[in-house]
């Protein structure tokens, strides 16, 4: 890991009392080997552990060790997901960063898993980067993929998740500038390489079903799908609208054209689409994933120089968790 980033995690991004503790302990000549356990306050899907291991790998020294659950593991409330045994001076200042990474990433991944399960086997793409700070957008999308999303919108998120590339359609802005959906679709088709799916927005200017047919006639077999993103002001995308678009495409001889739904999708709305048998092929989900609340994590010292010791309310010593694997 970049030394400058490590320094940032241990200074500007760290709770100030950790630096004050480091200075006080150093002045007293105290640098014990401590055993510290990290655990969550609720069930969920663990994410961010790979980043934590990378951080620890940059600060731990000879004789220090770490164990962790695997990235993407299901975790239970109060289950130990990360254990570090090492000199406190080496890793203590990273506590804020380690907890924050686990909290945010696990919150996003857990919500993504809920969305994916609600979709009943249909593809879910993360569209949430526009709802978070750009410095964390790719990390959020990586967590969404860990949670089960089939793709994400940003190149950075796709790269972090090991995908072949980002997923996306086209913005309303481009269609508005062209002034006609078919003109925009033809220009897009002419410019984009073959590996970019031709999925066209059809809610900008005309009735969605009418526009879907116009685009299907214009692009023919090259059209992979139409995207319905009807805004709140027009009642959003409904089950009936999806069924109508599907029926009209089929009647016109375009059964290969899929239907991609986005726009304010929640877990409950997706469940409603599935329960009603709406012929949706893929969902684009944004804020429901990106605005997921973080999962609280705690880090406690449980052992000091081999002697069980912890704060009141906790059990001293390092309990066994057979799911932990040695990572450092």
Residue ranges and their predicted role:
Residues 1-156, 160-194, 222, 298-328:
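Ordered alpha/beta subdomains of enzyme catalytic regions
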Residues 172-328:
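Glycine-rich phosphate/ribose-binding loops and adjacent secondary-structure elements
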């Amino acid at each position: 890991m970049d030394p400058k980033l490590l320094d940032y995690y241990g200074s500007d991004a760290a709770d100030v009392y950790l630096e004050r503790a480091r200075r006080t302990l150093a002045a007293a000549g105290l640098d014990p080997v401590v055993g510290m356990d990290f655990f969550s306050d609720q069930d969920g899907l663990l994410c961010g552990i790979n980043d934590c291991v990378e951080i620890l790998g940059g600060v731990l020294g000879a004789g220090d060790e770490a164990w962790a659950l695997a990235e993407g593991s299901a975790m239970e409330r109060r289950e130990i997901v990360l254990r570090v045994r090492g000199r406190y001076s080496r890793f203590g200042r990273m506590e804020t960063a380690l907890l924050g990474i686990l909290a945010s990433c696990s919150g996003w991944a857990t919500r993504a898993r809920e969305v994916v399960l609600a979709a009943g086997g249909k593809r879910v793409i993360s569209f949430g980067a526009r709802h978070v700070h750009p410095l964390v957008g790719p990390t959020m999308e990586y967590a969404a993929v860990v949670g089960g999303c089939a793709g994400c919108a940003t190149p950075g998120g796709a790269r972090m998740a090991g995908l072949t590339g980002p997923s996306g359609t086209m913005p309303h802005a481009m269609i508005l500038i062209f002034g006609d959906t078919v003109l925009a679709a033809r220009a897009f088709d002419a410019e984009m390489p073959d590996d970019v799916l031709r999925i066209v927005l059809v809610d900008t200017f005309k009735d969605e079903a009418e526009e879907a047919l116009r685009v299907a006639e214009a692009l023919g077999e090259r059209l992979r799908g139409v995207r319905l993103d009807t805004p709140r002001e027009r009642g959003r995308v409904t089950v009936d609208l999806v069924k109508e678009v599907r029926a009209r495409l089929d009647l016109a001889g375009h059964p290969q054209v899929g239907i991609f739904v986005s726009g304010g999708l929640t877990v409950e709305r997706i469940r409603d689409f599935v329960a009603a048998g709406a012929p949706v092929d893929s969902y684009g989900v944004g804020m429901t994933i990106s605005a997921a609340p973080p999962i609280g994590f705690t880090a406690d010292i449980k052992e000091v120089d081999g002697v069980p010791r912890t704060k009141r309310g906790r059990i001293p010593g390092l309990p066994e968790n057979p799911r932990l694997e040695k990572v450092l």
